[in-house]
Amino acid sequence: MLKQINGGVCAAKGFLANGVLCGIRKNRTKRDLALIMSEVPAAAAAVYTKNLVKGAPLLVTKNNISDGVAQAVICNSGNANTCNANGVEIAEQMCQLVSDTTEIKAKDVIVASTGVIGQPLSIDPIASKIDDLVEGLGNNSDLACEAIMTTDTKKKEIAFEFDINGVTCRIGGIAKGSGMIHPNMATMLVFVTTDCAISAKMLDKAVKADVETSFNMVSVDGDTSTNDMVSVMANGLAKNELIDEEGAAFDAFCEALHGVTSYLCKMIAADGEGATKLLECTVSGAVDDINARIIAKSVICSSLFKAAMFGADANWGRVLCAIGYSGADVDVTAVDVSFESCKGRVDVCKNGAGIPFSEDEAKTVLLESEIKVVISVGNGVGKAVAWGCDLTYDYVKINGDYRT
């Protein structure tokens, strides 16, 4: 059972964090450089964007943690360090700066960047503030969380306590993501820390399995970023028996990990650029989970559906349309659709055809800030959940002048 606690990435034993302003982008006053550090080397795992254009930090991180070990994360916002001729060199220098000011090896540093693509990233502002960044390390998950934000309007962090064979463990995470959210593992960065003792092999297995039902089920605008990354460090300081195989302990860890990731997914979707509503699509009765995920993701990605939700329009035909072109193995004559919110539920489609409903009641349901579209596609065992947001005028405004 999970117990929500405070602390974010600093909730787990032995983790410190900080965030400072180093001035990567001109005329900005927000923090733009974050550091998360474990007091001891930790098992590490990560998943990355499937975009063929990858940020230099991802390439460096993938090489650094190929041995399954990391001890720190450094991340800048305001510049993606992507499509830069010297990008890898800059990312490696960021790792070396951490090493020079701590006792951590440069190869044990996870490095990440988020921001504008194709603009040179100078190491100078980062180097000028690395001492302040390290000296200020403490229980400052919120500062690190602020420092990785770009167009985000809200900080995204969470932590839980959970039990492994009678031993209390903790896990926490921070995330950024508001636009370019359509991961295939927005820009989406997620950093998770835990004091649970788990082998790098099993951690990698847990992370790769989890993203299929968490971050890969989130979409804000259908754009897959060049810099998407989800990383997890597990330092073992909870002193539970090492999890090195499948079983009850591994299942408990996976449940805790999913508690963090699913919470952050909802926060990312709700904070979509210009968004006014969090959308959740649940699918049941599919042939299998894979087909259920295809259906849920297709609906949540539909621009027409998202626009209808912005207008509180119960246009269920757009849901059926998205199901039809999804490519899923589905009998469209067996599809039922309902809309739900805190104001109630309205059934709009039965067996693939419209049914009478009150437009006024539907409008009342859809005017809320959190909307569920509930879809049943038959009697199969497959089910899935996907998250997204409505499509508004402000999304265009935000992205029309992003570089300025």
Language model features: what each stretch is:
Residues 1-89, 93, 99-404:
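A structural signal for small-residue-enriched, beta-sheet-centric alpha/beta enzyme cores
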